[in-house]
């Protein structure tokens, strides 16, 4: 399991296994990636990725007004930086 931050400050936890396509767990507003801990434990034998959305948990917030597009761009940047080609 790898934890880290992207260049723009997104905190993530990546459990890379032989199964090449990770399951991505995205929490809601007001929560953190830790809300998914039971599911992450259940899927520990599979590749999975969880992260804190902008301004939540250990992820930074780079601007005051955040849109849904910003959350989408955050995920795209994360999977690009981790060189993930496909996700569930």
Regions flagged by a language model, labelled:
Residues 1-23, 44-47, 77-80, 84-86:
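Alpha/beta-hydrolase fold catalytic core
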Residues 10-11, 34, 65-68:
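Short, charge-rich amphipathic segments
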Residues 14-60:
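Conserved HGGG/HGGXW glycine-rich cap/lid loop of the alpha/beta-hydrolase fold
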Residues 49-88:
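Active-site loop/oxyanion-hole signature of alpha/beta-hydrolase fold enzymes
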């Amino acid at each position: 399991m790898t934890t880290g931050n992207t260049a723009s400050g997104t905190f993530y936890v990546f459990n890379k296994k032989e199964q090449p396509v990770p399951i991505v767990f995205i929490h809601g507003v007001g929560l953190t990636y830790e809300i998914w801990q039971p599911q992450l434990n259940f899927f520990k034998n599979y590749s999975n990725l969880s992260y804190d959305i902008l301004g939540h948990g250990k992820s930074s917030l780079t601007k005051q007004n955040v849109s849904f597009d910003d959350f989408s761009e955050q995920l795209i940047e994360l999977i690009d930086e981790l060189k993930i080609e496909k996700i569930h």
